[in-house]
Amino acid sequence: MDAPRGIRPLWRVPGIVLRERAHPPGRVRVPEPMVMDDPESVAHFHEGGLQNPGMQAVYDFGARAVDALLPLNGRLLDLGVGSGRALSAIVRRRPDLKVTAVDLAPNMLATAQRLFEEEGIDGQIELVKADITALPDALADGEWDGVSCMWTLHQLPEVEVLRGALRQIAAVRRKNDAAVWISDFQRLRDPSATEAMLQCVDPLSPLILRKDAMASESAAFTIDELAAELAAAGLEGMSRGHARPLPYLQAFWAPGARSPRSPIATSSPLRGAARREAMLLSLGFSAKPF
């Protein structure tokens, strides 16, 4: 039976969680194209980040994490900036940071540039068209206090490509003793879980955004898969956490030599439904750096 329009049928969540836990492992990953650059897809993805409280909460979560890991006036290398929403949340929270952000998709980079100019933060961010699996020497040899990779790894088509990206992150950390923040979707056991959960928690979200989220979850690596590849790349011993009760989001992090003892920013710009969603996400995450 369908819930009335606008009502979130949260009473269905326990059943979704139980089915996920009972489902046997072994679900096959369904890769996505490495570069999302179709103008219509980029536009829908970008606008969804502005209008959707759940996505705003996810971006705020990443901003709070990076805030806890980066020192005052720190330098951040962001791999896979996309349309810029996640990085915007970081820089608006921490206007002291200087960031170089990398992506391969021209339309994503152009969208991010417009966003940063509209928000008046473009002076703090340098955008570079580059492959995160083979960084230019100017970036690989740069001095960084932290390196972030947010909502990007699921776009990598093959495990060998993932390994290339993780080797770049490991090299930056090794050279600089830099902090690391990695966040992404996790592929669940039950292939129906993500769609069912979205119908519960975000029933009014546009269909194109829900389809994108389901495709991203299907393409994502599991926590165990990603943990093993991180260790193999030289990033062993990282802290990790995941969303609860359904572990559809995951994060790995490590402090750097100059990481602060506590977060530098103290307030959140979110209001209303987005602030509520951010609180629920933060409280539900199994572990986090803040």
Residue ranges and their predicted role:
Residues D2-P71:
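Conserved class I S-adenosyl-L-methionine
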Residues L77, S83-A134:
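Class I SAM-dependent methyltransferase SAM/SAH-binding core
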Residues A134-D141:
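Short conserved loop adjoining the S-adenosyl-L-methionine
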Residues S148:
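A conserved beta-strand element that flanks and buttresses the S-adenosyl-L-methionine
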Residues L156-Q168:
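A short, conserved alpha-helix within the catalytic core of class I
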Residues N176-D184:
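Conserved beta-strand signature within the Rossmann-like core of class I S-adenosyl-L-methionine
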Residues S183-L230:
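C-terminal alpha-helical "lid/dimerization" subdomain adjacent to the S-adenosyl-L-methionine
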Residues G237-F252, G256-F290:
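Rossmann-like AdoMet/SAM-dependent catalytic core
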